[in-house]
From Swiss-Prot:
The keyword Zinc does not apply. Residues 1-28 form the signal peptide. GO terms for cellular component: extracellular region. Disulfide bonds join C41-C63, C45-C65, C56-C76. Glycans are attached at N44, N89. It comes from the Eukaryota. This is Evasin P1127. It is found in: Secreted. Keywords: Disulfide bond, Glycoprotein, Secreted, Signal. GO terms for molecular function: C-X-C chemokine binding.
Amino acid sequence: MEAKTFAFLEIAMFIALGIQTFVAVTDAAGKDDEHFSVDYCGMNCTQQEDGSWTACSGRNGECRCYHESGKRSGLCLSTTYIDFSEYGNLSDSDIAAASPRLSMKESH
């Protein structure tokens, strides 16, 4: 009897986990107004003997050292997050109004 109860609860847990995963994936897939990117800065970082990490000097200070726990080497990465919903909804007329115009100079 205990084995059947345990098996039933285990199956119910896997079904609930599957539903939760499906909901999370479909919710994240609909986030077209957010953008997250990670770029490699072309260098690595290492942990020094005093515990500090070597600096990542690329891209005007945008690069940071990311490493796994317990590892003495890492990667210099630049991360960017943009939430496009902060900018509102631009219409075609807004974009046209913000576009640069050619100056008309008369020559004599």
